[in-house]
Amino acid sequence: MTVLHSIDFFSSSSAPVAIEARAPQSAFPEHHHDFYEIVIVEEGAGVHVFNGNPYTLSRGCVCFVRDHDRHLFESTDDLFLTNVLFRAPDAFRFLSGVGHFLPRECDGVYPSHWRVNGQVLQQIKCLIACLEHAPKSDQVEDIALHESVFMQLLVKLWQGCQTQVGDDQEGRLYQLLDWLQNNYSEAVEWPELADRFALPLRTLHRQLKNKTGMTPQRYLTRLHLLQARHQLCYSDNSVTDIAYLCGFGDSNHFSTLFKREFSQSPRDLRSQL
């Protein structure tokens, strides 16, 4: 597995933060690094496999990667990212309490993926632009100013995650996307789901395609297939059981779709493990 080292990304040993833009981000194999990373999705779509679990990416996704996590990007489609790198939550000279504004693992569950709305993405652009420039010097006041901008960015993201579940259409669409991610095995009737999240059906179709680059049904099928691949790799369930657990009513149809998506059959994937 590829290991990325901080010495290759930070401008100096005293630099607390580094910015790496990916415009666009191409597919990248599984890797980990000796620093922390905040991945902010500005445009496009793709799949982020984080510690073996697949997450679909779209504009407004924010991913928090620790120094012991492993991840990869695949199926990227004009995926524009800004990566904010920092050494560790407790590695700043003048900041304390950074961990309060980061995801916290609870009972083995780490909420690594957040969402923020378009307004927050606009608000943080100037902060990211400031962080792109290394501190003017190694003087304590320049390091302190640089760290303070990072804290502003972190607080903006945290506030944005707390408020994105608002009652406007964008907030309700984000709630719907999160529901689909967490309930991939349930049967979906789009008119009922539109009513559940108080979205006109045509608006749901249009906005979901704008956010993900896919029709709702294509997006749902992709979610099912990604979860099925995860089950094939990390469970002992049979191919037939996995097909039903992941929302497919017919195992043969599942195998056909799986091969079309990943260029190999479910059984071929299993045989390679």
Swiss-Prot record:
Domain spans labelled HTH araC/xylS-type: 174-272
Q: Does the keyword Cytoplasm apply?
A: yes
Could you state one GO biological process linked to this protein? Answer: regulation of DNA-templated transcription
The protein in question is named: HTH-type transcriptional activator RhaS
Alphabetically, the GO molecular function entries are: cis-regulatory region sequence-specific DNA binding; DNA-binding transcription factor activity
**Cited InterPro entries:** AraC-bd (IPR003313), AraC_XylS_family_regulators (IPR050204), Homeodomain-like_sf (IPR009057), HTH-like (IPR037923), HTH_AraC (IPR018060), RhaR_RhaS-like_N (IPR047220), RmlC-like_jellyroll (IPR014710), Tscrpt_reg_AraC-type_HTH (IPR020449)
Where does the UniProt annotation locate this protein? Cytoplasm
The protein's job, in short, is:
Activates expression of the rhaBAD and rhaT operons.
- Per the UniProt entry, what species is this protein from, by scientific name? Yersinia pestis
Subunit architecture: Binds DNA as a dimer.
Provide one Gene Ontology cellular component: cytoplasm
Q: Where is this site: Interaction with sigma-70?
A: 241, 250
Q: Which residues bind DNA?
A: 191-212, 239-262
